[in-house]
Amino acid sequence: MPKKPKISRSVAAKKKLKDHLKTHIGKSKKSSYYFTPTEAVAWYWWRVINKAAFKNKLPYPSEIVIRKLRGAWGLCNAKSRADNCVITISSEITNRKLFIATVAHEMVHQWQWYDKRSLDHATSFREWNVYFKRNFGIVL
């Protein structure tokens, strides 16, 4: 019996993310199901996106918090250069695709923090937006 070809973890994670978005979020009726964000689900998608988009190079944030936010779907905060980022996601998100896109959005800010120590929507953020849209159909 021939052996299965080995697939790298990041390729498998990309496929997992694409398949999930296509199956559960695309044009299917399942996308209209009510979704409740939890920290466990946020951590799950953080790990999947880290493998798929960042090749597992993004260090873990110090925490991911789900709480009510005013005027934003998510935040990525770091108080000092030595701190890991804290990612906060709005508890009011009821759409799975928006939730995954928000986690990805805040992960790009986390990457910006570790790479350049800035959290903005300038050139590097726009490049990541193109990457996520092209590869996963997610608009950050």
Regions found by a protein language model. Give the residues of each.
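Active-site-proximal or metal-binding-adjacent scaffold patches in catalytic folds
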Residues: 1-101, 110-140
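Walker B catalytic acidic pair
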Residues: 106
